[in-house]
Amino acid sequence: MLYYKYRKIINDLTWIIPNGNLRREVRNIFKKLLETADKIDCFVDKINRIDYIENKDNFVILKVAGGFTDQILTYVVGKYIEIKYNRIVKYDLGWYKFHGMDDYNLNKRNFDLLNVFPNLDFNIATEEEAILYRTLFYFKTSIGEEFHNLLNTRKKLYLAVRPNELECYYSLKNDFNKIFDFDKNLSMKLSGGGNKKTYDKIISSECPVAIHIRVGDLLKDLKKLDRNYFFKASEIISKKLYPKKPTFFIFSNDMNYVRKNIINSKFKSYDIEFVEENDNDSGFMDWYLMFKCRHVISSVGRFAVTVYAFIDYEDKILITPENIDKI
């Protein structure tokens, strides 16, 4: 891509502009010009090949990136497009080949969706299709008016869709709950180790509550999320569930930090279980164990909120940094 090839030169040239807003505007103009040049080069090269045969099919290609939650949500959007718009949907997995790291460049993200759900109707775009569509028909959008307008007016689309994907899930909830049969596909992976013991504790608990603490979120946004947030959320749920007694199952990507800084002496009156069996390569097992809980306390990320959406319990409770003062 020409823009990324010349990005440093563009930044150096525009840096001499003293006004920040004008500097950004000029930089965006350069970016648009180079993106347009990319599209023209790609299109001309494509149709000028001797072996070129015009493809009459019009696809919607979705960019797949991120961890297990993002993969589920992208598939939800794809299936929604197939059902609601009668479009052919393909998925671009190139991100896992060329980047494949989390937001903090600490942990590798694996494409686990088809390992967990091997029977999904999942049409993977070829590398050539992905490059062509990404170069010529790319739109970054969220679920909303622009999203629906694009699907109604464009024959060929390459979409990077975030956020609001759960709107697609809720509109076809019964269909997606059948597609994603977590018990059928993940209960067999419990084996006889720590995950099976945790599973047994969860299903035998009177009120199992999952607390998801992604440490990166804590360090990134301390104003919204600190150790007091999780204690306050635990107090709220305990009062709502009284006289039943909750058991709190702690899930985190850095349990040492959690033990030292968050789940401290304030929690001594609560029944606490630390779930430490799974590493970065088996995050889908944390997903399943949280899915078996009835209630969820979420950090800033999408993981816990998405798990909560799939939990089949009528009186389930979700606490997030956004709603904690409204519950």
Model-predicted segments: where are they?
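Boundary detector for helix-to-coil junctions that initiate low-complexity/charged tails
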Residues: 1-43
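N-terminal pre-catalytic "stem/leader" segment of glycosyltransferase-like enzymes
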Residues: 46-94, 98
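Secretory-pathway luminal glycosyltransferase catalytic domains
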Residues: 46-52, 57-58, 99-245
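Conserved aromatic-histidine-acidic binding/catalytic patches
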Residues: 62-70, 221-225, 246, 281
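Short, flexible loop/turn elements at secondary-structure junctions
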Residues: 66-67, 95, 163, 215-217, ...
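Donor-binding and catalytic core of enzymes assembling or modifying cell-surface/extracellular glycoconjugates
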Residues: 68, 242-324
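Short beta-strand segments
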Residues: 91-93, 212-213, 247-252
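Short, charged/polar "capping" segments at the starts of alpha-helices
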Residues: 97-101, 219, 254-261, 325-327
